[in-house]
Amino acid sequence: MINNRLKMAIAIFIVFSLVYSIGFITPMNSDDYTYALRELSFSGVKMHYLGWSGRIVSDTISTSLLKFFSPHIYNAINSAALTLMVLCWAIIPAKLTRSSPSPYVMIFLFFLYFIANPAFGQTNFWLVGSANYLWTNMFIAIYILISICVSNGNRSNLMLFVYVASSILAGCSNENT
């Protein structure tokens, strides 16, 4: 019999592989070119924040990924972000019920997200779109999960640091917060 941790590792691998395989064949488009050429200095980020989008977290993520990584690497990082978001969704109910996360719930949530998201490509594979929606929702999912862990009594220094960092990233992300 395969134990739950191995099943969860397989579920994580399946989600990551499916997302990466689609992202692998998705070309750069639209704002990806503009954000790849943006200046990534404090003054450049501030000017863009005040004059254009107001999304400091997502704009910095998209510019950093496009500027410093090859398409295959930023696609892998982006696939990991979606996988982490879905993993957080699967762990949240387990933490609330003090049970083990289910790999079947993770796979179900991934396919539900895939089917129910009418703009799946724009919010997950187009890199600037994923920075605006996927990454920011990932930070929100991490914040919710860490909040539950802290409220359940896990107040280690690392947990409190992640709690503060995730609250800032989630709070400064976009209109979802």
Predicted regions and their residues:
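Membrane-interface helix-boundary motifs at transmembrane edges
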Residues: 2-3, 91-102, 150-157
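Short hydrophobic/aromatic helix or loop-helix immediately within or flanking a transmembrane segment
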Residues: 48-79
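Transmembrane signal-anchor helices characteristic of membrane glycosylation enzymes that use polyprenol
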Residues: 4-30
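Membrane-interface alpha helices of multi-pass inner-membrane proteins
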Residues: 159-177
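Transmembrane-helix motifs of polytopic, lipid-linked glycan transferases
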Residues: 80-104, 142
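Extracytoplasmic catalytic/substrate-binding loops of multi-pass membrane glycan-assembly enzymes
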Residues: 21-40, 49-61
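Transmembrane alpha-helices of multi-pass, membrane-embedded glycan-processing enzymes
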Residues: 62-65, 77-89, 136-139
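Membrane-interface micro-motifs in multi-pass membrane enzymes
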Residues: 55, 103-148, 174
